[in-house]
Amino acid sequence: MSQSARELVANVRHELAAVLPERPCCREAELDALRDSGRRSDVATARTVHQLSGDSLVIAASGTPRELALRRATMLAARRAPQHCRSAFLRGRILARGSLSFARGGSHLELVLARAEAIVLAQAFAHVGFPGQLRERRGRGRSE
């Protein structure tokens, strides 16, 4: 990836991380998305987690971060789910598990997820006008 492409990706991540939801329900949705970050760590995401969790009442939920993300994704993929919470969760999943790739044919967003969550998240993205494809890479589920 060229230097300008890396800078663009970093700028997009920083812009997404700068959006702080006003509603408590949206903050909790985004936190659920960010808690399961895999091996990724960057300053923008860490700052967002700190800002979102600093002023909210965190209620202990049972399950691993991956299980909590799948539960939240399932709730927000429902057609009647609040759009504001769905957007906050999707933004968090992009920050936590997303990568932006550039090729000759254009650009695409990839999310590295467990297959169960990828299927549910594809529905949630479709509800906000971003239909995607599910692909399995290297034996792991991946949603584009």
Predicted regions and their residues:
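N-terminal basic/disordered segments at the start of proteins
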Residues: S2-G38
